[in-house]
């Protein structure tokens, strides 16, 4: 299976300081990849390269033709003096019908927020609205930079469930960045540990035993790391939190939005 994005021996240097050193990775349709690492490890730089905002100093970035990317930023900066409700905010990123924007909000369980002031949303509510904005692109690749930041533990669990549902509904690749090691989705297909270079990569349960992971984060982090396992003894929920039955992978994937060539 060909990768949506393939990075080969990619390096980035700022002012003679190597921020990323010989990074190679592939992102595949329907797979969740989580990037972990301490602050200053180069995670945000790698995200900028993946979404096309930055070019590497050396190495190759190969993207599938007409690749569509949905991006959820780490922080949302809005002008506090400008009144902005959720619907108006969503329409800033493109011309969408009210039906399309309401459907995106419904998918993430935020339909009730459509008239809410963006400045007054909680951390979890803001993340859901940002996810809705990304989904309006009908992405092949969903990139989430620290999606659980500012969200409480239960909110994080709900958010990770939502991301898992999105992966199945749209059959998209998900690339998620985090420095919080205390809650990592067991649904992640691959964890990549970054400290300017790739220290180690693999399944979440394997990474915590890897010598490079322990050297970087310490044995205490290994012992305290909680891998959230999705419970299979209850009804699955749709993206708005309603119980459903059947296979989520059978949902339709509509094509619409902005493309990266």
Curated annotation (Swiss-Prot):
Listed GO CC annotations: plasma membrane
Top-level taxonomic group: Bacteria
Enzyme Commission numbers on file: 7.2.2.20
PROSITE patterns: ABC_TRANSPORTER_2, ZNUC
Domain ABC transporter: 5-220
SMART domains associated with the record: AAA
Membrane topology: Peripheral membrane protein
Region described as Disordered: 236-261
Pfam families in UniProt: ABC_tran
Reaction equation(s) it catalyzes: Zn(2+)(out) + ATP(in) + H2O(in) = Zn(2+)(in) + ADP(in) + phosphate(in) + H(+)(in)
One GO MF term attached to the UniProt entry: ATP hydrolysis activity
Family to which the UniProt record says this protein belongs: Belongs to the ABC transporter superfamily. Zinc importer (TC 3.A.1.15.5) family.
NCBIfam families: PRK09544.1
Role description: Part of the ABC transporter complex ZnuABC involved in zinc import. Responsible for energy coupling to the transport system.
Protein name, per record: Zinc import ATP-binding protein ZnuC
The species this protein was found in: Vibrio vulnificus (strain YJ016)
Gene: znuC
């Amino acid at each position: 299976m060909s990768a949506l994005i393939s990075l080969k021996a990619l390096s980035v240097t700022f002012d003679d300081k190597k921020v990323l050193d010989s990074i190679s990775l592939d992102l595949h349709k329907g797979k969740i990849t989580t990037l972990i690492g301490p602050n200053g490890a180069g995670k945000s730089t790698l995200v900028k390269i993946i979404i096309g905002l930055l070019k590497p100093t050396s190495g190759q970035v190969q993207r599938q033709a007409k690749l569509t990317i949905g991006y959820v930023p780490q922080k949302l900066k809005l002008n506090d003096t400008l009144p902005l409700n959720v619907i108006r905010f969503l329409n800033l990123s493109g011309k969408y019908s009210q039906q399309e924007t309401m459907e995106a909000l419904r998918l993430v369980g935020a339909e009730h927020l459509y008239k809410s002031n963006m400045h007054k949303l909680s951390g979890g509510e803001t993340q859901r609205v940002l996810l809705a904005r990304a989904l309006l692109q009908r992405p092949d690749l969903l990139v989430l930079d620290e999606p659980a930041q500012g969200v409480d533990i239960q909110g994080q669990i709900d958010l990770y469930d939502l991301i898992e549902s999105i992966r199945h509904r749209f059959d998209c690749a998900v690339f998620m960045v985090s420095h919080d090691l205390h809650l990592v989705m067991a649904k992640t297909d691959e964890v990549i540990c970054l400290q300017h270079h790739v220290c180690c990569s693999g399944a979440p349960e394997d990474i915590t035993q890897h010598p490079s992971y322990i050297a970087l984060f310490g044995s205490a982090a290994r012992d305290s790391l909680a891998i959230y396992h999705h419970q299979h003894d209850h009804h699955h929920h749709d993206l708005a939190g309603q119980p459903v039955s059947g296979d989520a992978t059978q949902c339709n994937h509509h094509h619409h939005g902005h493309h990266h060539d």
